[in-house]
């Protein structure tokens, strides 16, 4: 007989893997926030078929390739968002560009209630999902915006602008750089060391106004693949 195949989910085992991953990353979260992370993962699984949020379908891979992958960047994102170098209303504000299913924006907002996260995407059904998550998870520090980031205007600016699967570094800088506060940082999440992208950024003349502060290697629990954070700031 035909029919849809369903993957059995061992919630207890997934919770243990999430808790172990958080410990490995160095994120000490209270039980209620771990509950919320787990609830977000359940929403991602539930609505993926409707909203086409990710090509990854297996629950274990969603945990490693999406949730833990995003959580591995949270310490750096939160540190830069809270930086005393950033003044005014921008401090503590993060813009997640091309957020899709909410990564890394929602894991960041769940883990750090003092950080305000705006997630932007050009696909309306994805921002609808993000708005639904905000309501169901009770995240007053998260919001979603539908539309291209290059048309977004925000007078308060952002301490951190991040992207996980949005665009090349050159496009990331050109399209979202106008929203960065003085002394803020663009933080791009990449896989392998993005030397070719850095070279193209230099060839485009962007290094006259921007500098690469650091390319930081990340370790994602349970994921045997390279991950890097590219930290950019204005000169």
From Swiss-Prot:
Q: Where in or outside the cell is it found?
A: Cytoplasm
GO cellular component term, pick one: cytosol
Catalytically driven reaction(s): guanosine(527) in 16S rRNA + S-adenosyl-L-methionine = N(7)-methylguanosine(527) in 16S rRNA + S-adenosyl-L-homocysteine
UniProt GO MF annotations: rRNA (guanine-N7-)-methyltransferase activity
Q: Which Pfam families match?
A: GidB (PF02527)
Q: What class of enzyme is it?
A: transferase
Q: Which domain of life is it from?
A: Bacteria
Q: What is its EC number?
A: 2.1.1.170
Q: Which residues does the record give as S-adenosyl-L-methionine binding sites?
A: 98, 103, 149-150, 164
Q: What is its main location?
A: cytoplasm
Keyword entries, A-Z: Cytoplasm, Methyltransferase, rRNA processing, S-adenosyl-L-methionine, Transferase
Q: What does this protein do?
A: Specifically methylates the N7 position of guanine in position 527 of 16S rRNA.
UniProt-listed NCBIfam families: rsmG_gidB (TIGR00138)
Show the HAMAP family listed in the entry: 16SrRNA_methyltr_G
Q: Which family does it belong to?
A: Belongs to the methyltransferase superfamily. RNA methyltransferase RsmG family.
Name of this protein: Ribosomal RNA small subunit methyltransferase G
UniProt organism field: Cupriavidus pinatubonensis (strain JMP 134 / LMG 1197) (Cupriavidus necator (strain JMP 134))
Q: What is the gene name?
A: rsmG
